[in-house]
Amino acid sequence: MASQARVRGAVAIAAAVWACAACGSATPVAAQGAVTVHELASGLGHGARVLMIGAHPDDEDTSLLTWLARGRHADAAYLSLTRGDGGQNAIGNELGEALGAIRTEELLAARRVDGARQYFTRAYDFGFSKSVEETLRHWPRDSVMGDVVRVVRAMRPHVIVAVFSGTPRDGHGHHQLSGQLAREVFDAAADTVRWTVRGFGAAWTPQKFYRAARFNAAAATLGFDVGGYDPVRGRGLGELAAESRSQHRSQGFGSAPRRGSVMDYVRLEAVRAGDPSAKESDLFDGVRLPFAAGDAAARRLGDRITALRLALDLRAPWRALPLVDSARVAAEAWCAFGRPASALGDVCRGTVPVPATMRADSADVVLVGVRLLEQLRQLAAAASGLVLEATVDREFVAQGDSATLTLRITNRGPRTARAAIFTPSAQPMPADTIAPGGELRATLPLPRYARTEPWWLVGGRAGDLFAAPAATVDDEVRSDRPVASVPALVDGITVQLRAPITFNRVDETRGEVTTPLAVVPRVSVTLDGGATALARAGAPLVRDVTVRVTGFAQRAESATVALRLPAGLAADRATAPVVLVPGVAQAVTFRVRGTLAAGRHELQATVTAGGRTWSEGFQ
C-alpha cells in the first residue's frame, strides 16, 4: 500500500503503509524432544477432518480445537471469515489492515499451540454490524460464500462445526452470517451447478454438521470432556487451550489455565453418516474414514504404525528410524494405490495438488496420505537427533541485495550422519559427515525471496473484500516464510531437515532474541500522524508533516524526500536531502500551508535514491 494521505469529511490526512506481518512475530521452529516425538507418533493413522467456522480471530472454541487436534489427533482447522481488521487494539495503535495483520499472526500463533490449521475468506472486517442485512451491504453474499465453498472443497472436512447460531441472538451481523454460511456450505459444497468445479474445486460432501453449544448445554446433543491430561507433556488439554486463547493479545484475551475435567457441547443439526436416529456417543459416530476401509494396504500400513509406536523409546528415538522409514514406504504405497512412483505419488508427497477429476473417496485417501507422509517426515527429523539452524547476517534484507546464509547442523544423537547442502544454483556441496556431538557449518549466498508482506494485501481491496483470492491452504503455508531445507542420512535413512531462516542476536537482559528474516523494500517511507487527521475545509491550514525514512541497502546512499500535495496546499520546500544509513530511521519535516475544499484528498511522501523512487513503507 502506498504511503499516502487521505482526506475524509472536511479534510483528513492519513498515512497508509503495508504491515510487515512476520517482522518480529513468533518464529515457527522445528520441533524437537520427547513431547514432539510422542505427539507425532500418537497422531499417525487418524484420518478424520473437522472444520470450525466463525467470523473473527478469537471467535473460535479453542477448547474444542485443542481437544480435536491434540487429544483426538484429528486434522482440525478454523475458518475465520475475517482477519479482525475492524477490532480494537490493546497493545498498540495499529488499526485497519495493520491490525488485521497483527491478529492474523496471533491466530497463527494460537494454531501452533492447539495444533489446528487456519483459513480465511476475503472479507474485510469493517467494524461492528447490527444485523446480517447490514453485513451483506458490505460483503456480497455469493462472494464470501464462494470463498467458504473453496475452503471446504480443498480441505474436505468430514465434520463441520459452526461457532454461531446464524440467528439475531448472535448479536453481531458478522457472527450471524458465519453461522448461516456454515450451514449452507454443508449442502453447497456438493452443488457443482451453482458452484462449478472449474471455479471452486471438486465437489465434497461433509457427513455431519454441528453447532457449538458450549454456552447452552441444555440444547446440546453431545457433550465431551475436553480437559484430558497428557502425562508426557505434563499438561492438560485445558491448559493448552488457555495458552492458545491467550495468543489474542491485541484483544486482551489472556486466559487462566483450566485443569481437570472441562466439558464442551455441540448440537447435531444435519447428518449423512450412520443412523440419524441413533443416539450419539462420539463426534465421529458413523463417519466413514479411509483407514476404516480394511483393505490389505490399509492393514499393512496400520500394522507398521502399530509396530513403530510399540518400539518407540522416547529416550532414544533414533532407534525407531528404520520403522519410521518402513511406515513411510507403506504410506506412499497406500496413498498412491500401489503406484508410489507414478504422478499420483507426487500428489501424495505434497508436491502437486489433488486432481479435481479424482473420485471423492480416492481423494479422501490421498488427503489422509499427504498428511501422514508429512507427519512421518517430521517424526523422522525429530527422532534423528539432528538439529538444523539457518541464520542470516542481518534482520532486514532489501529486495535485490545479497546476504549471507549460515546453515548449522548439530548431531545430538549417537549415530554418525551425513548431510548434503544445496547452493542457490541447485548444485550440491560435497556431502559431509557429522560425528555424534559434532556439527556441520556451511556459509552460502542467501537465495532470492519474495518481499515479506501480508499476501492478502497485495492488490488492495475492492470495497470490503480483499482483491487477492482466498487461500485454499493453511494460512501458515500460504504465508510462504523463508525456510531452509537440508537432506541428511542417518544409518542410510533419509531425513529431511527444515528450519525457518532467522536473524539471531544476544540481548543482555533477555538472552538470545530470534526474529524471522524480512525481505523489505530498499527504502521505507511513512508519514507520522496515525491513520487520519482532520482540518477545517476552506480555512487556512498550517501543519507540520513529518516523513519517516529508513534505508535498508547494504551501504549508505544519498536520497531526496518530497511531498506530493493536493491542490490548494504547498510545502515550505520542494525536496529535502537525506543520507540513508542502513537500518537507521530518520525524520524529515515539511511545513504545509494553504486551504482545501471539503472532500477527500491525498498526500503522498516519496523518496528518490539511485535513480528510483519509493512511496511505500512498512511497520
PLM segments and residue spans:
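Proline-anchored loop/turn motifs at beta-strand termini and strand-loop-strand connectors
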Residues: 412-450, 559-581, 593-595
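Low-complexity, acidic Ser/Thr/Pro/Gly-rich terminal tails and inter-domain linkers that flank the onset
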Residues: 355-400, 504-538
